Amino acid sequence: MNIVNGGAHANNGLRIQEFMIRPDKAKTFSEAMNICFLIIQNLKKLIKDKNFSTAVGDEGGFAPMINKNEDALNLIIKSIIKSGYVNGRDVSICLDVAANELHKNGNYSICLLYTSDAADD
């Protein structure tokens, strides 16, 4: 499920287009939806606690004004843990990096995943 938008889907500093979660622990569709709902509610609270907007991007995920992909990933990991699940076992994080957006001058560049400030870190 798509939970954070960046790239072409949002007007923020994230270069990754979609941050998603996959509820691996779920045995039924209903259980999967409940897991995702709980994580999304906790993510929303974490975003609000950082004084970011909880507005959504083009694909329905939150689109907070975050500049670093790592910061978005950390928020998602914290929301998974806060929801009582283990990241990587109960719930997996999936990414749509939109590789076509990383293509420049005939080559793919991982540096395009980061803002110029983040690339300097």
PLM features per residue range, with description:
Residues M1-N2, I93-L95:
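Hydrophobic faces of well-ordered beta-strands that scaffold small-molecule active sites
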Residues A8-A55:
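Mobile "lid/hinge" segments at catalytic clefts and subdomain interfaces of large enzymes
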Residues E18-F29, S53-N69, L102-L112:
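Active-site-proximal beta-alpha loop/turn segments in soluble metabolic enzymes
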Residues K44-F62, K82-C94:
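Flexible, glycine/charged-enriched surface loops at secondary-structure junctions
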Residues F62, A99, D120:
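Short, glycine/acidic-enriched loop or turn micro-motifs at the edges of active sites
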Residues E70-V86:
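Noncatalytic alpha-helical scaffold of FAD-dependent oxidoreductases
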Residues V86, A98-N105:
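Short acidic, Gly/Ser-rich segments with clustered Asp/Glu that frequently serve as metal-coordination loops
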Residues Y114-A119:
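Conserved small/polar residues in nucleotide/adenosyl-binding loops
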